[in-house]
Amino acid sequence: MKVRFQADADLDRRIVRATRRREQAISFQFATEARSGVGLINLPDDKVLAAAASEGRMLVTHDRRSMPQHFGHFVSAGTSPGVIIVPQNLPLGVAVEWLVTIWSASEAEEWANQILLLQK
């Protein structure tokens, strides 16, 4: 199965829009589209991880500070489709290219319980 992405509430919306524009077949939800439109706004990290996992989506976030720790706790108790951390200073085009490459060159199962920090 192809990777499906879920943006958290803090991810720059331009990343979602540009990725969707670059490859229309990619399933990438804004934070407001998650949980059948209820969204991920103002949820703690553990609930965001649970929501993404319940929909079988890799979480895409800028949160390098607390998300890795919450992710570690989450996968110690269950399974996650994975997390991608996009540094705030990563150029938009580079972030989009990474996400499109991950989507096109891998399967969702390969990312289970994995966390990836994107680099330039």
Regions found by a protein language model. Give the residues of each.
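Acidic, PIN/NYN-like endoribonuclease modules and their adjacent C-terminal/linker elements
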Residues: 3-35, 39-42, 46-49, 71-120
